[in-house]
Amino acid sequence: MSSGKKPVKVKTPAGKEAELVPEKVWALAPKGRKGVKIGLFKDPETGKYFRHKLPDDYPI
């Protein structure tokens, strides 16, 4: 895990709230528009990967 990223409070696919650090972060935006930031997280219990929206002020 990269140490430069801060943990985000997300809801895992299992339905639990967890503070996780995204493994990958990218912006999802149509051309010329603001868009949203998406993070790739790994569920600590099941080991499955899932995506979740990040706050707008999150560094990429």
UniProtKB/Swiss-Prot annotation:
Family matches, as Gene3D superfamilies: Chromatin protein Cren7 (2.30.30.610)
Outcome recorded upon mutating K24E: Slightly reduces the melting temperature of the protein. Slightly reduces affinity for calf thymus DNA and poly(dA-dT) oligonucleotides. Increases affinity for poly(dG-dC) oligonucleotide
Known outcome of mutating K48E: Slightly reduces the melting temperature of the protein. Slightly reduces affinity for calf thymus DNA and poly(dA-dT) oligonucleotides. No significant effect on affinity for poly(dG-dC) oligonucleotide
DNA-binding is among the record's keywords: yes
Locations listed in the record: Chromosome; Cytoplasm
Pfam families: Cren7 (PF11520)
Keywords assigned: Chromosome, Cytoplasm, DNA-binding, Methylation
Principal location class: cytoplasm
Any one GO molecular-function label of the UniProt entry: double-stranded DNA binding
GO cellular component: chromosome; cytoplasm
Sites bearing N6-methyllysine, chain numbering: K16
PTM statement from Swiss-Prot or TrEMBL: Methylated at multiple sites, to varying extents.
Quaternary structure and interacting proteins, as annotated: Monomer.
Family: Belongs to the Cren7 family.
Task of the protein: A highly abundant chromatin protein, it binds double-stranded DNA without sequence specificity; there is approximately 1 Cren7 molecule for 10-12 bp of DNA. Constrains negative DNA supercoils. Induces DNA compaction and mediates intermolecular DNA bridging. Binding does not require protein methylation. Binds single-stranded DNA weakly. Increases DNA stability against thermal denaturation. Promotes formation of loose nucleoprotein structures with long DNA in the presence of albA proteins.
Protein name listed in UniProt: Chromatin protein Cren7
